[in-house]
Amino acid sequence: MPHSERGMVVGLFGGSFNPPHQGHALVAEIAIKRLRLDQLWWMVTPGNPLKSRNQLAPLAERLAESERVAADPRIKVTAFEQTLGTSYTANTLARVKARNPHVHFIWIMGADSLQTFHKWQKWQEIARTFPIAVIDRPGATLSFLSSKMARTFGFARVDEDDARVLWKKRAPAWTFIHGPRSGLSSTAIRNGSSHSDAE
């Protein structure tokens, strides 16, 4: 895991990043700015249990590309999940919390992930581990309201104007952050296009 100091506010931004692109970098930049992050851990996962491995580029390649895309020095590109041997986000976050009890973590996800978030293993446990910042993505601005996560944890929503103090909230707590959006999509890039209305 990247090094962090006691009291730091650290964003956790996980994904396959297959490939990483400027849309991911934009989400990271918005999160750093709006959440007042000291660091953002760009967590490149060895694999995604919900996605096919057939088109998954080698981890080393995705790490190198992520380093190229993530220019901000506060972004720490890492693949520590491979070392931990964890495949599921809930297990990874539990390990992160246990190893860093004095760091304030926020889980960061694109709004397009909310529609399937309830299919993640122990998804409600994830929501109860760290506060969550959902960053707007093209095509997901309105659909996030109908997501199972938004309905289940509607009581825990924090106003976007208070995003900068989300780290002070006890989970479950989440906020939806609007901002500039990129139409870039890893799926579209893999399929030979650079834009997708769906992601």
UniProtKB/Swiss-Prot annotation:
Pfam families according to UniProt: CTP_transf_like (PF01467)
Catalysed reactions, as listed in the record: nicotinate beta-D-ribonucleotide + ATP + H(+) = deamido-NAD(+) + diphosphate
GO biological process: NAD biosynthetic process
Matching Gene3D superfamilies: HUPs
Pathway: Cofactor biosynthesis; NAD(+) biosynthesis; deamido-NAD(+) from nicotinate D-ribonucleotide: step 1/1
InterPro entries membership: Cyt_trans-like, NadD/NMNAT, Rossmann-like_a/b/a_fold
GO function term, MF aspect, one: nicotinate-nucleotide adenylyltransferase activity
Protein keywords: ATP-binding, NAD, Nucleotide-binding, Nucleotidyltransferase, Pyridine nucleotide biosynthesis, Transferase
The protein's Enzyme Commission number: 2.7.7.18
Protein origin, superkingdom: Bacteria
Annotated function: Catalyzes the reversible adenylation of nicotinate mononucleotide (NaMN) to nicotinic acid adenine dinucleotide (NaAD).
Family per similarity comment: Belongs to the NadD family.
Protein name: Probable nicotinate-nucleotide adenylyltransferase
Species in which this protein is naturally found: Rhizobium johnstonii (strain DSM 114642 / LMG 32736 / 3841)
Species lineage: Bacteria, Pseudomonadati, Pseudomonadota, Alphaproteobacteria, Hyphomicrobiales
Gene for this chain: nadD
